Amino acid sequence: MKVDAPVRKAYWLVCVFALSFFGCQQQPPQSVPPIAAGIEHLLNDSGLQALGKKLFFDADLSTPPGQSCAACHSPEVGWTGPDEALNKGGSVYPGAVHSRFGNRKPNASAYATLTPQFHAVREGNEVVFVGGDFWDGRATGWKLGNPAADQAQGPFLNPVEQNNPDAEAVLAGVCRSSYAPEFRSAAKRIWGIDDACKADTDFAYGIVGLAIAAFEHSPAVNQFSSKYDFYLKGKATLTADERRGLELFEGKAKCANCHTSRPGPNGEPPLFTDFRYDNVGVPRNPDNPWYTMPAEFNPDGEKWVDRGLAEFLAEIPQYAMFAQANVGKHRAPTVRNVDVRPTPSFVKPFGHNGYFKSLEAIVHFYNTRDVLPAADKVNDPKPGVNCWPAPEVAQNLNTTELGNLGLTAEEEAAIVAFMKTLSDGYQPT
């Protein structure tokens, strides 16, 4: 697409104001606010949110048509994977080409826009990484000013997801859609572009990412309407089990060390994540279909190991030196909506690879990972009963905040009861 003068002018304006002061460069920012300067007004724009919703649910923006963002991020399951059969097994979802699979469980897209841009902080002698979207942080937010906006562009072009050959193909689909007038209108109203369908490809594709992020930022997605939210406002009462679970969550079980549960300094609702990276020792999921993907996608085959954050750090010159110290680490997800499901018996997987098939299972793992023997040391191994499989990655294991928490079965159940109060859609009586 040819760039005319008005578009070049608009691009400069968007770099300065709309995409934050860091949006024109692929470099890590020096300081990172919760939502980067100049981006919040876009995320709160109701017209951009409405456009983003149509993009999010459009199944015609894949090659072949048939896969929308919602295929892996569905509201009825807390904006993550809605296919119970897949959840029970590998927990990784197929792409538009149904024989192709990715390598990790879909993250929840709710509350993702509140993730800070990917950055490093120094704590004593340690460099700690914070923020970024995807399990490995590679959607940094350095491009469009918000990690969720960067993330929204990724699946469209991933051959194991929506499989479009390039951004122009995505834009062609947008421009022939029923909502193409809204795309043009938003571009004209916000950025002064006469026709977004004839604008610079990178710029127009940036609008797509920003619009999807705006929808994900809307009250329809980031609801803050759980029982716990009402409890914090004094409008709901926790049961005895839920109160006990909250006490354990913030105390003995150490959950709140990573899944922050208290309001922010200005009363902001808690996000239940510190956006940092840990290796909690999740076992390999033998049902992960990534192991059987062709060599063009997975050259390591059955020997593939999920290196997590390290894989991304190794690609960034200024951070590559920290890759080894972060092998096996994945970003702590929010635990908001962890129990949202269409029916009480519906199976939701947990962990970056979906190894755990219930909240009870992953809480028990955090409690007993270092207590039960390794699976290869027992006869008739039953994970979670008489053993746990070895971690997929044994190095950089977090041994200070989980593994031997000393919780009773009743205390584990209380923690699960509390986590169930984090589901949006609660109706106070």
Task: Name each model-derived stretch.
Residues R8, F22-C24:
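Intrinsic low-complexity/disordered segments
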